């Protein structure tokens, strides 16, 4: 699980390749996460809530596979098709920590924090994009983004999967 923020381009990091494309993702938006924290501070929270572990997730409306999240995000950013921008071997094939959490509904039962899903999140991403980025993404060919932005991120950064393979790490 992860907290989804509207400034998606600030997350351009090699970790985007650490996840297998078929990984199940359940996120929680920044607003819903903030509401969760605020609601946890209320006097009305029952005593049995405390001293337990919970998985924070946005529920069914915030569940999708990583490949779906990547493609829908690239669409909103105006970047194009995932297969035109990346290579399959840039992505890990196993062992990442995201899942769908059945018990995140227990937390929702206590704190009533959920109000947003994938569609609302992607609307926030689009609204947060500066005009120059919206225009730039639409006029820049996918091969340029792949070659000068995403490939270096996948291959040249010490935290990237392909760097590890290329440098026997």
Q: Which role fits each region the language model picked out?
A:
Residues 20-24, 91:
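Short coil/turn segments at secondary-structure junctions
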Residues 3-5, 15, 25, 56, ...:
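Weak global preference for isoleucine
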Residues 2-4, 29-33, 74-77:
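Short linear motifs at secondary-structure transitions and domain/linker junctions
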Residues 7-15, 24-54, 59-61:
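Alpha-helical substrate-binding/gating segment
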Residues 39-110, 116-139, 147-169:
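Mid/C-terminal beta-alpha module of Rossmann-like enzyme folds, strongest
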Residues 1-21, 79-83:
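A short C-terminal helix-loop "cap" of Rossmann-like NAD(P)-dependent dehydrogenase/epimerase domains
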């Amino acid at each position: 699980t992860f907290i989804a923020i509207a400034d998606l381009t600030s997350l351009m990091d090699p970790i985007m390749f650490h996840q297998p494309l078929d990984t199940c993702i359940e996120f929680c938006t920044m607003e819903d996460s903030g509401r969760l924290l605020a609601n946890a501070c209320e006097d009305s929270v029952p005593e049995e809530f405390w001293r337990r572990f919970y998985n924070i997730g946005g529920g069914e409306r915030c569940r999708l596979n990583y490949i779906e999240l990547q493609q829908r995000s690239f669409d909103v950013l105006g970047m194009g098709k995932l297969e035109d921008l990346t290579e399959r071997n840039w992505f890990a094939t196993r062992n990442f920590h995201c899942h769908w959490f059945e018990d995140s509904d227990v937390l929702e039962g206590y704190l009533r924090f959920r109000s947003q899903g994938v569609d609302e999140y992607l609307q926030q991403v689009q609204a947060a994009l500066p005009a120059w980025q919206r225009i730039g993404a639409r006029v820049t060919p996918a091969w340029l983004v792949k070659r000068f932005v995403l490939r270096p991120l996948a291959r040249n950064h010490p935290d990237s999967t392909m760097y590890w393979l290329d440098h026997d790490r």
